[in-house]
Each structure stands twice: as structure tokens, then as C-alpha cells.
Amino acid sequence: MPDMLEQTNALLAALKKPSTNVDQRLQLFSNVKSNIKHNRVPEECQAPIFECIRIAISATTSATLVSTGFSTLSHFIKRLQLQRETAVITSQSSKLCALLLEKLGDARESHRSASLQILADLHPLCPLEVETLIHNAMKGTNARAKDTSMTWVVKMNQTENLPFRAYSAQMIANLEDADAGVRDTAKHAVVDLFTSAPEHAKANLKKQLVSTNVRKAIATYITAHLDGAATGGAHEEMPPPPPAVRERPLPTQRAQTLQPDHGIADALAAEQPPPTEAVTMDPIHIYTQRELEDIFRDMAPPFEGRESEGNWLARDKNTTKLRRILMGNAPAEFPGAFVAGIKSLLEGILKVANTLRTTMSTNGCQLVQELAKTLRHAIDPWVEILLQCFIKMCAATKNIAAQNGNVTVEAIISNVSYNNRILQHVSFAATNALRASWVKTLIRKHKAHVEHSGGLDTLEKIIRKGVTDANPKVREAYRSTYWTFALVWPQRAEAMFETLEKREKTALEKDPNNPNASLASSQSSAVSSFSKSVGAGAARNALKEKIAEQRRAKMAASKVPERPMSAAATYSPVKSASTKSLSARTASTASTASNGPARPPSAMSGESTKSALKNSSGTGSLMSGTVRRPIRRPELNRPATADPYAVRRAGNGKTTPSMTPEKTPAVTTTKKSVAPKSSVRPRAQTQNSPNVSPIRSRSRLGQSTTVQKTASASSRQASPAPSASKDEDLELTIVKPFVRSQSHHDPGTIPFRQRNGLDKSAVFDNETVLSGDEDNFTMVIPNLARPTAQSIHHTPPKTHSPSHLSAPSPRASMLRSPKSMGDINGFGFRSSTRSPRVRSPDRPSTRGTDAQEGVQVFEDPFVGDEPAAVEHEVEKPVLGELPINEKNIERRPSNESISSDTVMGNASEDRPRGHHKTTSTGSVLYSESNDTNNAEVLKNRQLLASGIKKIESRTVESHMFRRMQDMIRSNHEIWGANDENFGCLLLACLDFLEVPTEELKTTPIKVANLKVQALATIRAMLSLYRKETAKYFSRVLCTVLQTKAQYENTSHIAIDLETTAEEIVRYGQTSDCLNAVLALIEDLPSSTPTSSPSSKSSLTSLPGAGQTRTATMALSTLAALIQISGAKNITLSPDQTSRLGKLAVRCMDDQDADVRKSNIEFCIALHERIAAPAGEQENDGFWRAVAGAREQHLNLLTYYLAKRRAA
């Protein structure tokens, strides 16, 4: 065909001529391509056409010309195949493949796709050359060529079933390629190729992934997709469950009348499977038998020997892995290898099941249960070993272990083949309720085997013994077993029933598992009424009625008539020992809370009680009537006016005089001021009303308060009787409340409780002040509420001669002491703050009051008007805390009685020098003991000095540390003048803590105990004496960091060291601690590859691992200090910022991974502290500080900072 030849020659000439227009070339190419598509290509035109195509594909000036060349080549190959003249293709294959290899890595996607298609077309014609080209492309350096070649392999495998085994090794190698695109393509190509591959190929793939050290994320992705595909296929191919096999009906008429569904309901409930696991476990699929054998071989070492801290976790993980394998395909596809592997690990599995770790033991028991349910008869050879183990476990004292053993035994019996040894093990077990369920399981699952093997007599003996057992729980369990036995062998059950006693028969008939229970109950109801009177239930009811009647008669006989004018008539029943006194006294005070203009004649009278009841809020109150004990023994009756809670003297033989004097004049009275109606609710209405919620005062939370103790207040509060005229010699005895004066307050503080009527006088009990005085003593107290502007002064109260004093009581000493008169904040309610100590005003003694002055009777100081001048009224909570153990509290000051101003040294008064210690909240405790020179204090000081010497000489024992800890927590003044021993003890403990273990000449266990005690002593001083230890915080922090080098991170003392460092960071001086830690870590020798071996360091004695632990903890501490500096608004100086940045850059090159990890966290904290806002990167102080870091380290920092920002 001359036309095609002419066109081909013209095209070849145009392609070879550079000056030919591109459009002309394309036109000529289109003509040739059209002739190829529609006409036969003569042999003389084939070689020139190949040359034209080669020139066009290799052209670089026109992409359109290249695409036309690929299109023409595709049509040309198809035409030659139709003409069956492919020899020219094989002859030109070498040139063509070289050209296509170049185009596989072309920048244009269209060119790569065209070359990929051409290779697919050429593969049937010259497969060797094409596969060689693909191998070269996958091994080459061009990333695009690698992507295209792997895509070609996947395409050819899916369309042409191309074997890919020859390419798998290179694809796995490409999983670790430097180019991320190549890794991603290789990952998806491996998944696509191996999804339909056989299981042994997948197993080999996993081994190659491990051997080539493929990164974990890619390997996990591939494994998960392959396992997911296998799981999905298994679920799709799973056959439907077989229909349930119905058991044959019972042969006899008696068995046909029984109802098993209703008669053994409790047994069915007991056999429900254990609850589903909280943690879902995915099955593990095994692809080859060799892989399964390798897994069992790797599991063996942790199961050997005894359980220890080093192998228990591996045992638990292996047990969980076995359960996952059991859920997979291994038991079905490789049963022989699986059973053999389980047998080799059986001893270790039983060790796991018998461990004392509850979760681990449960895991082992569940594994055995699942083995029994899955392998069933395959575990018959191990049945005796398993039963011996788990029957023994059923006797464990731990309930969870016993239940696990019971469930496991039932699972084993239910699923294995029966033999006589199983029945013997069950019969040999101790008689208990669990054995009853095992017998039921044997009857249900193996009834035919038991009957034919001669085990029926043994079963009968077990059930008869259980039904007649002495334990009621065992009898109850075996009744259900009996009726299960009766379902299968009714004749034997009836024969056994006839041999039982009447009690056992009755219990069996009434058992809920009895199918004929309704018939038995109807028969029993038809019995004569005689059984109702003589039966056990009727006898118990009659006995109960008789006891109740006797109780009512006793209560009626023991009733005591009400005592008029009784002091106990208004007392509520005692609720507890701690509130006994308070409840009685509040009831007495409540009777005086009347709204009338004047008080009633007597505070203890019944009329006053009734008036208080009328003012009570709501019905149902505790004061809704006269309250007395329901049963009062006659021998405890007291006189009508006795106060059961009054204070009595020991030894004087006198009784408390009447609250209402017998000689009180009826007409002559002293004029007194009338108290107006109170604007607040009376105490009786809030103390005894159940409808009032106890609302705490806000002053306890938000304001600085001075807490007043009102112990025993209003316990014997009585209304003042009308006093006689001035000329009448009247002997008046009044039971007086225990009242403290209110100390003077600074303008910035308010009293905790402004009592009603504190501007009036009060009467004091002479017994409280002077224990040896007569009973006719009356004390007049002047105005208690003083103006805040009054100056502070101290005048000791006038007291009597010591000859009048008996043994001092705490309350008497409180009133005599100027300290207790002015500062009573250590008692009763406590606040976290305290106003400066002041002295109480003068108190004139009324011992020698002139007879013509008359008796002054004043209003109840607790029920009067509230002072109008008080702006912040603080009410005491109705059901708040009660001041108990006053005597003990008086000797021991409170831990929270000093304000925060005292901690900072801003106290308004110069306190005497005394022992002081700080609590964990920073408040200071002062103990102003007058016995600083007593023997105990001197002894403790000598012991402290001896302890310090022993610590310095490294001969101290642990009991000495504990003794010093007790002295530190005590209130004794053990530190001496200017607290010189305090610093000596702290520094000695710090030096002892830093000493290496090798330098202490004792055993390592004892050294560890000594270090722990030394650290406990240091922590006690830090927490209790925070003000004194403030200057040592940086020193202690450095010691803690250096000591950390001696201990592993998992040791207990390491945890205590970290806790101590956290407390110092939280409460210490941030700037000082920051500088100290910086100096410490800067002195550490660098562990970078470029570090000099002669680097300067003060810690050169530290080993490599110890130095790493110190550096890691120091970096974490620096990060915490930087964070807390931001919280405290502490500015980092430029010098500190520069040093921190240099440290960060230095630690980036550290050889230890833990140090680098801690350094990253430290850099993140530093960035959050000093980084500039977004958009001001040029002013960012963080990047300037770390400017010396290498580029890869800066990139790593940027990654973690972006990750933190995204989180």
C-alpha cells in the first residue's frame, strides 16, 4: 500500500527535521494512526512506524506529540496482534522498554498512565522484558516510577492473575522507603495483594514485616486489614447453629406429671453463664501450624518456676492471648498442635488460676472454662488434674476465688466425657452447697452414663447425706438436687423419700423446686386446726405475743408521775455522750426565750417550758411536750428540784441548792431594766425545731474571725429572782453560767458570735472561779462588749489567797490566767485565721462587795437584744460542732489558730519566744509553755543533740529517726535558743540522704530503711515548720534530685522523693529553686556524643544511669517551676531565660531517651511561658532562647508544639 508507506516516510522526515511545525507533525501522525486503525499495516511500513513512535514518545518539546505517540503505539500493537505479526515487537522491545521505563517516572500523570497501559499490553508479547523493567523501576531512585510500577503489579494481579511473589520482597522493602508517597503506595499494594492470598503467605508476610523492621504503624495497619478481612470472611461463611436436641421423655407416669421448667427454677438460675467481660477481646487468627508452635514456645518461659514480680504480668498477658487464640481459628484448623501446646502450658495455666492476684486468677479460670467449652472431649486426659485443682479452689476463703472455682468445675463436668473418676472426685469433696450443683450437673449431662456405669448408688448416697446434713444451707441446696434426681429416676427418689425422717420429708415437700408443691400445700391446709396451736410457727407467734404483753405490763408498772418544778422536766433525751451537757443546757436556756416584757419567776418551771413551747416553730418539734425517758427505774428517782446535769463538788457532801430560793421575798424587788422584744429568733425555736436547717456563718469562710468558746453556757441559766431591799440581809444562791469575756478586737476583725445581752452584767459560778468558796457567793461582771477604739491593756484579775484554792481545774485556771481571759481562741470552734492576741479588761472581784451595795441581777446574756453597733452579725450554727474535751484542748493548742499575717511576720504584737510550727496550710502554731526548763524538754533536747551527732557520724538507727519525728510533731521547745538545732538537724538529714549507699557500712536493706526514715524526717520538718524551712527549700530540692540518682523509678523512696519535690515546687520560692536546679543540671556532665570526657562536674561520681535519673527529674522539676512561675506571675529574668534555652539545646543531643523526652516537656512548658503571641514570631523569646539548636531538633520541637496546640 503505497499510500501508507508514503505517509509514514513523510511523517518520519517531518519528525527528524527540527524546523517542522508541531501542528504539521500532529496532522501527519493523525493520518498514520487512522490508517493503522482501519487498514492492514504492510511489513515494509512496520519498522518506520516504530521509529516514528519512538521519536514522538521521546520528544520533549510537545506533550501533545508524546500523547499522540502513546496512542498510536497502543493501536499499532493491537493491529500487529490481529495480523499475528508480533516479531517486530519483540525485535524492538529493548528500545521500547528503555523508553517506557523513563516515562514511568515522568512528571505528568497522563504520561505515566499511558506507559503503564502500554506495559500491560506488551506483557503477553514479551513478559520477561516487561517484568525486568518493573523490577528495575521498583528498585530505582525515582519515586514516581516506584509508585507506578507497584500500581502496575496490583492491576495485573487483579486483572490477569499475575503472581506477585517475585515482587513482594521489594514491596516490603519499599514500606520503609524515604518517600512518604512510596510508603503509602506500598502499604496499600501489600494489603490489596495479600487480602486474597493463602494463609501461609500472610504468615510469611508478618515474619518479613518483623525481620525488615517495618515501622509499627504500617505493620499494624497491614495486619489489622488482613485480620479484618479474615474475620469478615469467617463470619460470612459461618454455618447456622444446629437445632437443639430434645431429650427423650420420661418413661414413668410419675415423671410425666413433674414439671421441670417450674420445679428446678433456682437450679436453672444458678447455671446461667458468667457475666460478659468488660474488656472486649478480638480473636487472633493463626495462619500456619508453625506460627502456632512458635507462639506456644515463646509463652513457655514466663510460666516456668514460681510467680514473681518479674513474670506475673507476662503470665497474665499470655493467658489473655491464649483466650484470644481460642476465639480464633486455631482450635478448628490446627486442633492437634493447639491441644499439644495447651498441654505443654497446662501447669503454668493452673499456676495462674491459683494465684493470689484476683484479676489474674479470674483470667486463668475463664481460660479453663473456655477450653472446656471449646475443646470438650479433647481435654479428657486432663480432667482429674483440673478437678483436683478447682475443687480445692472452691474451699478458698476468698469468695471470688471460690465462685470462680465452682463455675470452672461445673464447666468441666458439663463438657467432658463422663467416667467414674469424676463422680468419685465429686463424692470425695467436702459436703457443701457447691457439691449439690455439681451433682445436678452430672444428672443432667451424664444421666445415661451414670446409670450404666454403676454410679447411681453413689449418687443416691450423696443426695441422702446432703438432705440430712447438719448445715441448713447444704440441706436447702440438696433439696433442689433431690428433685432433679426425681425427674430422672422417680422410683429411686420415692424409695429414698420413704427412708427420710418427718422433718426432712416436710422440708422436701415445701421446697419450691417440688413440682407438686401446690398439692402438698393444699393437703397441709386441710389438716385440723390442732396443728395451728402446736406447730412451730404457732408456738413462735404465741411466744411473741406473751413477751409483748409482759413488756407492756412492765412499762405500765414502772411509770413515774410527773414531778412539778422538776429541773429535768424540760430536758430532752440524751442523744450522745458528746452532746449530753449541751442538749440539757440549751433546753434550759430555751425556757427563758419569752417575748414578754419581763422574765418568768423561774427558768426551770413548767410554766416557762409551756411558754417556750408556744413560741416553738412548727409542730413535730422535739420540744412539743414534756420530754422524759420512756422507762425510768425507781431507784434512780431524784428529788423534785434536782438538776441531773448540775456540777457537783467531790467530797463536800453538799447538794446543789434550789434554783428558786425558799426565802425569796414576794413583793420587795429591785428595779431592773426591761428587755425589749428580741429581733432574732429565740434559741429554743432554732435549737429544737427540726424544720430549721443549720446554716453556717460566712465569716468562717471569708473573713478573719475570733472564735469564742461558750462551753457550759446556759447549762444552769436561771432567771434572777426579785432581789430584796438594800438594808435586808439576803442570802441568795444562784446557779450561774460559765461565761467568758469577749476579748478586744482590732478594727479589721469581727467577733465570731455577738451574744445577746453582752452589754449587761452576768453572774458567775463561784465554783468555777474558786473551788473552795462558800455557796452564797455572787459575782457581778461589768459590761463585756467594749468599744473597738478602747486601748489594749492587761491587768491581772484580783484573786484570793492560795489558801482558798483546791486542786485547780482547767476551767478555774482559765479564769485566773490573764492569757485565758484574753485569748480563748484555742477552744471551741476554730478558724484558719486569728486576730492578734490581746488582754482582757480588769475584772473587779465581788468577794468583798459592800453589804449596802445590794444584789444586782442582770438579764440573761444570751437571750437579750443584739447590739445595734455590730454591723456583721455572725450566728452560731444550730447543729454545728460542739466543743468537747475542753481539758485536753486547753493543754494542746490548735493547729490552725494563727493567721497568715503571722506567717509573713506581720503580727501586730510581739509574742513571747516559744515553740512554733506550721501546718500544711502555712499557719503557725504557738505553744507558750511556762515549763520550758522541765525535765522532759531538757531530755528531748539532749536526745536531739545526740541524734544529730549520730546522723553526722553515720551511726544512726531507724528508731532514732522515728523518735526525732515524734519530737518534731510535739509541742515541746526542743530547738533551743534561736532554733540553732533546727538547722543542724535538717542539714544533717540532707547530708545523710545524699551519702551513697556504699559509704554506709551496713546491709542494703537497712540502708534503704534509714534513707526512708531520713526523708520522712525532712518531710515532717518541711510540712510542720514551713516558715523556718523556707530558706532551705532550694537546698532540699537539690538534695532530692541528687538522691534520685541512687534509686530506680519504681522504688518506693523514689516516689517519696518526687512527692517531696512537687511540694517544694508548690510552696517554695520559685526563683531560688529555679536557679538552684539550673545550677545543678548545668554541672551534670553531658552525655552527648560530642561531650568531652574531661567536662567539669560536681557529680562525676554518679554512674551513668544515676546521672540520667537526676537529669530526667531535674528537667521535669524545671518544667513544673516554669509553669508555677506563670501561675504566681513571677517574671523570668533574661539571664534565666538564656540559661534555660541553653540547657534545652544541650539536652536535645542527649543519648538517653528519657532525658530527651523530659527535655521536650520542659521545652513545651518554656514555650508556653515565654512564647510571643501569634503573629509576632520575630519577637518570640522562646525561639531566640533555643537558637543554637540544630534544624532537625527545631523541627521536632515544632511538631510537638503543634501537637500540643491541636490537643
UniProtKB/Swiss-Prot annotation:
Q: Where are stretches of biased composition, namely Low complexity?
A: 576-594, 711-724, 791-806
Tell me one GO molecular function of this protein.
microtubule binding
Q: Please give the InterPro entries that the UniProt record associates with this protein.
A: ARM-like, ARM-type_fold, CLASP_N_dom, TOG
Q: Where is the composition biased (Basic and acidic residues)?
A: 869-878
BP GO terms, sorted:
astral microtubule depolymerization; cell division; mitotic spindle assembly
- What family name appears in the similarity comment? Belongs to the CLASP family.
Query: According to its UniProt entry, what is the function of this protein?
Result: Microtubule binding protein that promotes the stabilization of dynamic microtubules. Required for mitotic spindle formation.
PANTHER family (alphabetical):
CLASP, CLIP-ASSOCIATING PROTEIN
Subunit structure, interactors included: Interacts with microtubules.
Name of the protein described by the UniProt record: Protein STU1
Q: Which organism is it from?
A: Phaeosphaeria nodorum (strain SN15 / ATCC MYA-4574 / FGSC 10173) (Glume blotch fungus)
